[in-house]
Amino acid sequence: MSKEEFPHEKDLKDEVTPDKAPKKDPKAAPKEEVKENPVENYEKEIAELTAKNKDLEDKYLRSEAEIQNMQARYAKERAQLIKYESQSLAKEVLPAMDNLERALAVKADDEAAKQLQKGVQMTLDSLVKSMKDQGITEIKAEGETFDPSLHQAVQTVAAENDERKDRVVKVLQKGYQYKDRTLRPAMVVVAQ
């Protein structure tokens, strides 16, 4: 016999022989194959998907509501901006109006000063009309009951009688309102 006819030793090591075969434990219970019911699997999957669908639908509805709320807030803010668009300009013009009123308070002695005062009065009247056209009005103060949202008490004086308590007795600087907002409170003297 030639060498090729006999199997190599390494080939023999891999062969399974009766003495090398895995031994079965006679006491071990036979393996039971667990067969799952396919209907139960589908029912579980349907229940999981239904719950997930409800969760996603809830998230969608919440997102939709949030978008609607954002749109409503945006519309409200925009309406506020449009409503009060002249507010900053009015605040800038008020000191100029105060200066014109101070100029008119000075007594004019000669004819040239009186003519100048007339021009200042016309300018002030024009500004006041423009302010009223935009919804800016003077806050009524003298003789009114003190209101901290409209008046700023700069000084207090003793009341002459009980009727005048908490009443504005003198206006030091006019206050103005723009629609329903106070642009500048009136600086007043209040009786206590």
Swiss-Prot record:
Keywords: Chaperone, Cytoplasm, Stress response. InterPro entries: GrpE, GrpE_coiled_coil, GrpE_head. It is found in: Cytoplasm. The keyword Chaperone applies. GO terms for cellular component: cytoplasm. It comes from the Bacteria. The keyword Heme does not apply. GO terms for molecular function: adenyl-nucleotide exchange factor activity; protein homodimerization activity; protein-folding chaperone binding; unfolded protein binding. Its main location: cytoplasm. It holds the Pfam family GrpE. Residues 1-41 are annotated as: Disordered. Belongs to the GrpE family. Participates actively in the response to hyperosmotic and heat shock by preventing the aggregation of stress-denatured proteins, in association with DnaK and GrpE. It is the nucleotide exchange factor for DnaK and may function as a thermosensor. Unfolded proteins bind initially to DnaJ; upon interaction with the DnaJ-bound protein, DnaK hydrolyzes its bound ATP, resulting in the formation of a stable complex. GrpE releases ADP from DnaK; ATP binding to DnaK triggers the release of the substrate protein, thus completing the reaction cycle. NCBIfam families: PRK14140.1, PRK14162.1. Homodimer. This is Protein GrpE. It comes from Lactobacillus johnsonii (strain CNCM I-12250 / La1 / NCC 533). The gene is grpE.
